[in-house]
Amino acid sequence: MKRSILLAIIAFLQFFTSYGQYDWDNVPIPANAGAGKTWKLQTAASDDFNYTFNPTNNVVDFGPNGNMKWYNKYHNRPNGQPNNFEGPGPTKWMQNHVAVSGGNLNIWASRIPGATKSFTGSNNTPISRPETRAGCITNKTRVKYPVFVEARVKVMNSTLASDIWLLSPDDTQEIDIMECYGGPGNDNRNSYFASKIHLSHHVFIRPPNFKDYQPADLNSWWGKNGVTQWGGKTIRIGVNWVSPTRLEYFVDGQMVRILDNDAVQTRLADGTWQYTYPAGVTSTGVNGQLIKENGYQKMNIASSLSDAKNKSNISVIDPFNYLNNGRKFSKEMDIIINVEDQSWQAEAYRSPNAAEMANFYDNNLLVDWIRVYKPVNASAANSAETTSTVEKPASFEPQGQPTEKLQVYPVPATDVLNISQSDYVEARVYNLKGWVMLRKDVIDQKIDVSSLKKGIYILEITKATGETVKQKIVISE
């Protein structure tokens, strides 16, 4: 009997050691791995920063227990040689502005009185501003689609940029996971941008014929009702790089934006979805220009993402074919985390002033963890690195009948459930024990249920207003 108990304890400890080792273990993955797929953690690229790394003036690798995951500078060139780019605008990246302590990555900014840096302004005129010294790190493991990258971050209460991004080694393809200017400034000069998170990407033609495209639609500056500034808030933010032409953005576990080849779906500040596509461009060649309205890219509104895609013939990834590869993200990318004093902010005199820079805590970016997953076949999911999205059991009793106008079909379903009304935005599927087996956004009035096994479940669908409806569904093979 004692031997059995001892073996059980050993087995439990082995399980706990294998499966309870990361800070994010109890945080469900919000993105969909795809039909027949599950998520597998990429341990080399992921980090929960539960170790100590002290600032140094030297370029060094660092990570937990000798497992070197990062180097403390901007990413290297494709040939592995150092990249001497110091940073945008008045930014000067410094190795000694990076540390790991207290369970967080710390990247901060500072100034040296009298130090300035010159850069070229928007009208090709030279501009000089106080030099902002800041930290920058690069992951030693590159990523490529399909991949989900998510971080838990305390956004700086600063007009400086809190950044997590992906960049190809040749600097031509960029996906911005988070670009946030979270502080309004002591005179509220940055209040508009402080209330937004910029969900964007870039494609470039590099010098001598430099060109830079990024989405310029109003919805790329994402906001949420009740949030007047992101600075000082701790958020989860991630991107699911699904394919060369599809990006899905998540904030605090909720999908908020999709770029799908030639159309866009964005969750507005009130929680409702808006579906848009470009109203036009002057040309789809390299010399083309966006059609703008009130300073932003002019977009047409559609009734659904599929409707927008059917009506659009202009890429939202690379409308001017800068990449010359079929208008798609095709290259593996480096994961970069840094702080920046960006040129357009500095030119507009929205950089932190001396008094604001004196507050170290407002200008220190904290990253609790960053995790990276790739989808694998569910049948092959048998290692400790494989993670499903099943949540802890809920206290649940089926309740509330759907209104007569609402229909959920087919019955039984195999791969997709259709919902007859368009105002439902989120769905959860429970088994009869009350466990959440599936959690997804409702897209185009459809729910992908292909990952569910045969059986009877309870579907709970929620409107943007918070109103919910629950009913039984049947899944067949």
From Swiss-Prot:
Keyword Membrane belongs to the record: no
Residue runs in coiled coils: none
An annotated Gene Ontology molecular function: beta-agarase activity
Domain GH16: 22-378
Active site: 174, 179
Inducing stimuli: When cells are grown with the low sulfated agar.
Annotated keywords: Glycosidase, Hydrolase, Secreted, Signal
EC number, UniProt record: 3.2.1.81
Signal peptide: 1-20
Feature: compositional bias, Low complexity: 382-391
TM annotation in the entry: none
UniProt-annotated stretches for the region Disordered: 382-402
Residue numbers binding substrate: 94-104, 123-125, 174, 179, 206, 340
GO-annotated biological processes: carbohydrate metabolic process
Superkingdom: Bacteria
Location relative to the cell: Secreted
Function: Cleaves the beta-1,4-linkages between beta-D-galactose and alpha-L-3,6-anhydro-galactose residues in agarose. Cleaves agarose in a random manner with retention of the anomeric-bond configuration, producing beta-anomers that give rise progressively to alpha-anomers when mutarotation takes place. Requires at least 4 consecutive agarose units and is highly intolerant to modifications.
Name of the featured protein: Beta-agarase D
Species assigned in the record: Zobellia galactanivorans (strain DSM 12802 / CCUG 47099 / CIP 106680 / NCIMB 13871 / Dsij)
